[in-house]
Design a protein with these regions (language model features):
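Extended hydrophobic packing segments that form well-structured cores
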Residues: 417-456
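Accessory "access/gating" subregions that flank catalytic or transport cores
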Residues: 201-333, 337, 445-456
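C-terminal domain-closing interface element
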Residues: 65-85, 113, 343, 348-355, ...
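Alpha-helical support elements that line or immediately flank enzyme active sites
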Residues: 17-34, 293-305, 350-358
Length: 456
């Protein structure tokens, strides 16, 4: 069983699968090399499939090298690390794990391949060689979405994640509802009891507060930072100007729909920070990192100030929904399109908000189902391989959809026709049926309608 904090992780933008995952892979590989690190004279990085096709726009190349240098997504000081990396590329010397220098030629030692490796669309192989050109070690990694990374052996053996026994196990939404009903528990209460198999409640409290703090700080940076996002599209950050407009109009307008502008603002701020490579919370991916903070801030600002108890309830319920998608379908845009990113995040947010609004366990799952039902078929076709267009606006749309799905579920008096389990199954099958052009390759859709300059 996964922890909700496997779904909610602190990292850096712009992508959990294409930035955080490769950084983790690079870090793991260099740790694997430590016993013979002094023998390493050369490292070769081979990127495949979506990691190659959108790798430059998603900073996959940079992230992999930063991982090899000893950095991890949760703790990296991205400004300092990027400066160190720039110096390394200029001098042609890469310092492995911060302690062993090797020669590195970006154009010879980091290779992009359009074909896929056999087990997943996001594959990469890292190889180490000695001074004689003999291979010392190699490993193939798959970045399977949401910052989850597995070796080929782990994927083949089904051991990519630790198998932790919890008090109330479930593998489907129906089983989750049955367990809660059988033991007379709310979904939030049941999931938090399961979390005790991973850590004490004091640690859960601290992690929940940290998640909200990072989300809020990210949003504040987004409010304050003006300018053009890098990458060549000349996309202007919109959050600062929208905030000024909303604050200026607060006293003179009486627009009942203005709350939607605030929700858009919250999502824009986080998504623009993510696009700029800032620190975000993967929820469940970086490409969808603006949805859940926007819904939480909507509740905090317009309904009721969040306390730790409410925050834990939201994260528990929404995290459980994310776990269902992760284990029974996919949260990888390269595997199932954006329905697996913004679609899943919207579904998670709808469930969490419904819990905060006092919805029943059944209404929570109904809200999650509604949000996904109306995300089915959503493509992942980022222009220029950048997490900018359509990604930033799509996060805002996902947040608004989540709130509407929650309201629909709370007001409904009849039973729904489609269960959450069925819509998860449908999402996965739809993604597998989707042409690869629309699964994070930038080979179709909007990515071809508007051709962007190649990212350097």
């Amino acid at each position: 069983m996964l922890s909700i904090f496997d779904i909610y992780k602190i990292g850096v933008g712009p992508s959990s699968s294409h930035t955080n995952g490769p950084m983790i892979a690079g870090y793991r590989f260099v740790q694997q090399l430590l016993p013979q690190l002094n023998k390493v004279a050369r490292i070769q990085v081979d990127l495949y499939g979506s990691l190659s096709l959108t790798g430059k726009g998603h900073h996959t190349d940079r992230a992999t090298l930063l991982g090899l240098m000893g950095n991890q997504p949760a703790t990296i000081k991205i400004g300092d690390a990027n400066q160190t990396l720039r110096e390394a590329l200029q001098t042609g010397k890469l310092r492995l794990n911060g302690q062993h220098d090797i020669a590195f030629d970006y154009h010879q030692d980091l290779l992009f391949h359009q074909d896929n490796l056999p087990l997943h669309e996001n594959g990469m192989t890292l190889s180490a060689f000695d001074t004689q050109g003999q291979q010392i070690d190699f490993e193939t990694y798959y970045s399977v979405g949401g910052g989850f990374v597995a070796t080929a052996e782990q994927l083949q053996n089904g051991t990519a994640t630790a198998d932790v026994t919890v008090t109330y196990p479930f593998t489907s939404a129906d089983e989750m509802l049955h367990q809660a009903e059988k033991h007379g528990l709310s979904l939030g209460g049941m999931i938090l009891r399961n979390e005790l198999a991973f850590q004490e409640m004091a640690v859960i409290d601290a992690k929940a507060d940290q998640i909200w703090r990072v989300m809020s700080q990210c949003m504040e940076r987004g409010f304050a930072t003006e300018g053009i996002l890098e990458g060549g599209l000349n996309v202007t950050r919109r959050a600062p100007s929208l905030l000024k407009k909303l604050e200026a109009n607060a006293a003179i307008e009486n627009d009942p729909m203005e709350v939607m502008d605030w929700i858009n603002l919250f999502a824009f701020a986080v998504s623009e920070e993510n696009a700029a490579g800032g620190q975000v919370v993967t929820s469940p991916t970086n490409g969808a990192a603006g949805v859940i903070p926007a819904v939480l801030m909507y509740y905090h600002r317009f309904i009721k100030a969040l306390d730790t108890k409410q925050l834990k309830d939201f994260l528990a319920v929404s995290g459980a929904i994310g776990i269902l998608y992760k284990t029974n379908a996919s949260i990888s845009g390269a595997e199932v399109g954006c329905q697996g990113e913004v679609g899943v995040s919207s579904s998670m947010a709808a469930a969490g908000l419904t819990a905060l609004r006092g919805g029943s366990n059944e209404q929570i799952c109904m809200a999650a189902e509604i949000a996904m039902e109306h995300s089915l078929g959503m493509t992942c076709d980022p222009i220029g391989g950048l997490v900018q267009v359509p990604c930033i606006e799509r996060n805002a749309m996902g947040a608004v959809k989540a709130i509407n799905a929650s309201r629909m579920a709370l007001k409904r008096t009849s039973k729904c026709l489609i269960s959450l389990d069925k819509v998860i199954e449908t999402m996965y099958q739809t993604g597998k049926d989707m042409n690869k052009k629309y699964r994070e390759t930038s080979l179709g859709g909007l990515a071809l309608i508007h051709l962007a300059p190649l990212c350097e």
